């Protein structure tokens, strides 16, 4: 009962994707509760943090590159309603990118994406490095196979670009 109340309160306090200032780095860094018999998705990277700036040659564009892993750990699948990436800038501004269908590039005809129990997905992320960006927050929302609304987040900090 307490876990369900905490989840309901947490979902009620989610930032609105339409509000530009609703997301914070701290919000993306919060750990989600691992509730028994409910989907639990871990979103992470194996890259050293902060993600380093890479530049192949002096003439090439500097980038931040990392793989984002999304793994369900409780054996309960999730129908994904939204995968959102928020890029944070030193100025406090954000850019918000959200996908609601085919979020993993499955080309499934516009139907919602699905992550099965104990399944892992990987996204390759490459961003042009600049002096203003400080990192990206990732959020996955959906409904698990038991009808529970779920939301999971992570924050990926970027190495400071000094060119």
Residue ranges and their predicted role:
Residues 20-38:
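A eukaryote-biased signal for short, well-structured alpha-helical docking elements
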């Amino acid at each position: 009962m307490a876990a369900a109340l905490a989840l309901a309160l947490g979902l009620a306090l989610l930032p609105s994707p339409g509000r530009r200032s609703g997301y914070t780095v701290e919000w993306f860094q919060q750990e989600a509760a691992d509730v028994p018999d409910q989907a639990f998705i871990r979103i992470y990277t194996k890259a050293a943090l902060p993600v380093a700036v890479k530049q192949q040659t002096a003439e090439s564009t500097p980038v931040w590159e990392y793989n984002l892993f999304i793994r369900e750990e409780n054996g309960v699948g999730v129908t994904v309603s939204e995968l959102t990436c928020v890029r944070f800038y030193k100025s406090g501004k954000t850019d918000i990118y959200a996908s609601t269908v085919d979020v993993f590039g499955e080309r499934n005809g516009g139907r919602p994406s699905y992550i099965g129990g104990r399944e892992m997905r990987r996204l390759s992320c490459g961003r042009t490095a600049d002096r203003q960006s400080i990192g990206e927050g990732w959020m996955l929302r959906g409904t698990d196979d038991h009808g529970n609304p779920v939301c999971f987040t992570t924050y990926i900090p970027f190495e400071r670009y000094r060119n």
